[in-house]
Amino acid sequence: MSTNTRCPWVGKLPIYIDYHDKEWGKPQFDSQKLFEKICLEGQQAGLSWITVLKKREAYRAVSHQFDPAKIAQMTEQDIDHCMENTGLIRHRAKLEAIVKNAKAYLAMEKCGENFSDFVWSFVNHQPIINDVPDISVVPARTETSKAMSKALKKRGFVFVGETTCYAFMQSVGLVNDHTNNCCCK
């Protein structure tokens, strides 16, 4: 196997190659980083991931590096300012979702529920390494992502449908869907 072989969806953009090689499918256990990813996956709904990836630094800036306590304090006026920011996806419901999700995250913490433990419980705290001979076998959603979506919604999260949850699971390494010949498998 060539050390340069990557999943075919990566393409040639350096930002995408870097994301694929250093983040996608790598197990992430930090609760705040997991929170960032679930929020960003929600921003992707209906768009390509590269669109969100290119805007990630702008999201980090307006969300105080995805600090849930600071995000939860954001007001309608703050959202109005975000709507004027060309560095963000200017979709009010998606921007408001980040605030709602921060409040849901904090409510979980208040009840003694650790976000990382919660997320990883869906895969018994072990990454699932899938057999992926080619990307055509990778599902858009699974029973596990369906269960995660339902559990997140029950806790007050929004923009966390089954497909969004599966993309989240892939991105944070709950599942490894790198193709079998990928250098990152």
Positions of PLM-derived features:
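HhH-family (HhH-GPD) DNA N-glycosylase catalytic core used in base-excision repair
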Residues: 1-185
